[in-house]
Amino acid sequence: MNKTPTTLIIMDGFGLRTETEGNAVAAANTPRLDQFFQEYAHTDLSASGLDVGLPAGQMGNSEVGHTNIGAGRVVFQDLPRISKSIDDGDFFQNPAYVHAMDACKEKRSALHLMGLLSDGGVHSHIDHLFALMQMAKDRGLERVYIHAFLDGRDVSPTSGVDYVTRTVEKCRELGVGKIATLMGRYYAMDRDKRWDRVEAAYDAMVYGESAHVNPLPVAAVKDAYAAGVTDEFIEPVICDGDGTISDNDSVIFFNYRPDRAREITRTLVDPKFDGFTRQYFPVTFVCTTEYDATMPNVEVAYPRQAVRNGLGEYLSNLGLTQLRIAETEKYAHVTFFFNGGVETQFPGEDRVLVPSPKVATYDLQPEMSAYEVCDKCVERIESGAYDVIILNFANCDMVGHTGVFDAAVKAVETVDECVGKVVDATMKMGGIAMITADHGNAETMTQEDGSPMTAHTTDLVPFILCGAGSELRQGRLADIAPTILDVMGLAAPEEMDGQTLIVK
């Protein structure tokens, strides 16, 4: 007997904004979404700041969004958790950090601090680096090297020079630390097994090898700008040849978001890594959060706080079936993050991964793999095998990050077409479809001065309920899971403090 599906469609990076200037969502031709807004109950959801467990005014992101959606409650995020520990002093006694620094003194080795130099708050925060530098000084360390990854994606594309300047000044102020290497996140923070990029980052940090050498970090960034290269894409630069990562050194990776921290970490800690040829050697390595439960030879400074009875676990315990489907760029979000940071696949949970296209930047192929994701999802819906389907279309976010307006418009139009097909298939099976987003992006493609805007936004996101409910209230992402359970006639578990969006 065929199941009646409840399908949740997450349009990654699709926010709501009334102004049309630089708004790829408004500029796009979206006949299907226009139809759904016209025909079905809809509302707006908060996807940023305190409503998703971030500091007030902090833009949302995909990890946080999917975590809150899957949990059915507001989940306190790593950024405020770590920042609070700095404020109350616990940070400076963190056992993992203490061990890494003490190991340097015992072995007379160097401490390396690596991570994204940014205050965008998505993957890292520069204040956490500065706290580690202060801690290193307090513990009497002298050889402290910084491997700076430049952002340009969650913040302005040419803001890197400011962060590098601040870091150089902080080194001077404390009398501790030197920038050994700097590079765009394009190289150091890949998540799609583009090992040529990761190898370039590794070679710079471990071997001190790169075509670019400049002992002046600020000048190195300015040189890149002069050549037309923005922060994200700056090729690795060697700033201090003595600052290579060597045997028995300690490394602290201060990024707290796992997905883009895994690959470069594995090159340094996993003897079985085979993405490219390199020599393994022992280091004391600290991941600020748990990047991967299978990661060997690491300590974790801030272990993940368990999310009990999230939507996936709850459905599984009830004996219901569920499908998670996305392309590579967002696969971790509909699985790992949606499940509250649990690597385990729950009984009754199937997963479909569609490879993302191998292009340098997604403005070159704004359709990405959406059509294949759509076709595979429709096929699974028509199979009648699933009670719940969780689907992510990556386009609006990934193409939005490029800052290329016309490509973002095409991305929105692609998503519109695919969402229409998935909703049609769901309704044909007698099911209910929900359309939403995890955060904003494509609705704001330009900054006030007209330059490209590549970061997320704090805008509200849509929620459309196709096939049930005549009136919806405003809410937040944590209310989606209770709404799914509501339309399925199921009580929400007591751990979920989100509330159904349906007005009774």
What residues fall within each predicted segment?
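Feature captures the catalytic ectodomains and active-site-proximal regions of enzymes
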Residues: M1-K504
